[in-house]
């Protein structure tokens, strides 16, 4: 006697598919937040959570200087150079290098800055080294013993250099205030301090819905372009805001 055995395939319920899709989306968003510049995610989230909030438009600073003669103004070149660090996925690694420069695929927050300047046609290392050599007493970390292998990569030193050679700007940030936000422009340099920890970053040419610029920086594990400037300001972490004198 033969027994007929029917094999029934279990069908996946629509609810399960929906839950799996939500989980997958969350994983993708978290992954992007950690490893990539989540500008598009931030903007999508803003429109999703504030569908009726108007976008604050901020007048962009006009810059005509083109130091490297590539047809792109210096401020835009700085931003492009900083953004290249994000694109290149530079690994955050803090080491001492003979000659000063780390490998192209390594760096810390200050390396993003000098690379951005290099993209605009400036040799930030030489400028910092020359200023320290001529004014070592102004740079506490050097202790009258300049070290070109590391000085230009120390945020403490850059926080002395930029007030001397760039325009010092406001530390006050007001979201949705177009006049105040016009003082925060692409290519601006921002220095923060939290306890004894220093950090340096560059402002993006992109802004959030409230008109606040995004920040391009390397705080590890890789460089990112993120919406964190308002948080820094609210926490009192911003101790320097500079603009190169184009």
Show which residues each predicted segment covers.
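N-terminal capping segments
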Residues: 38-162
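...with weaker cross-activation on analogous glycine-rich loops/strands in unrelated enzymes
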Residues: 133-221
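Bacterial peptidoglycan biogenesis and beta-lactam-recognition machinery
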Residues: 119-124, 193, 207-210, 233
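N-terminal Sec-pathway targeting helices
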Residues: 5-27
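N-terminal intrinsically disordered, acidic low-complexity segments at the extreme N-terminus
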Residues: 1-3
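Low-complexity, Gly/Ser/Thr/Pro-rich intrinsically disordered linker/tail segments
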Residues: 210-246
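Hydrophobic alpha-helical membrane-insertion segments, chiefly the h-region
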Residues: 26-36
């Amino acid at each position: 006697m033969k027994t007929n055995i029917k094999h029934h395939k279990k069908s996946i319920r629509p609810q399960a598919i929906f839950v799996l899709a939500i989980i997958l989306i969350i994983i993708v968003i978290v992954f992007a937040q950690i490893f990539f510049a989540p500008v598009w995610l931030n903007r999508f989230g803003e429109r999703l959570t504030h569908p009726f909030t108007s976008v604050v438009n901020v007048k962009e600073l006009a810059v005509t200087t083109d130091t490297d003669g590539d047809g792109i103004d210096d401020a835009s070149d700085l931003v492009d150079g900083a953004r290249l660090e994000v694109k290149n996925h530079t690994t955050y690694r803090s080491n001492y290098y003979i000659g000063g420069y780390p490998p192209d695929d390594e760096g810390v927050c200050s390396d993003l800055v000098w690379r951005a300047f290099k993209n605009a046609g400036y040799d930030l290392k030489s400028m910092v080294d020359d200023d320290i050599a001529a004014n070592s007493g102004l740079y506490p970390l050097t202790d009258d013993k300049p070290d070109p292998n590391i000085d230009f990569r120390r945020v403490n030193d850059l926080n002395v250099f930029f007030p001397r050679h760039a325009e010092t700007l406001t530390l006050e940030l007001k979201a949705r205030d177009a006049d105040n936000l016009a003082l925060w422009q692409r290519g601006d340099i921002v220095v923060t301090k939290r306890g004894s920890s220093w950090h340096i970053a560059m402002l993006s040419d992109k802004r959030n819905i409230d008109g606040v610029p995004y920040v391009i920086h390397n705080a590890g594990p890789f460089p990112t372009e993120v919406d964190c400037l308002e948080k820094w300001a609210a926490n009192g972490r911003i101790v320097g805001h500079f603009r190169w004198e184009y």
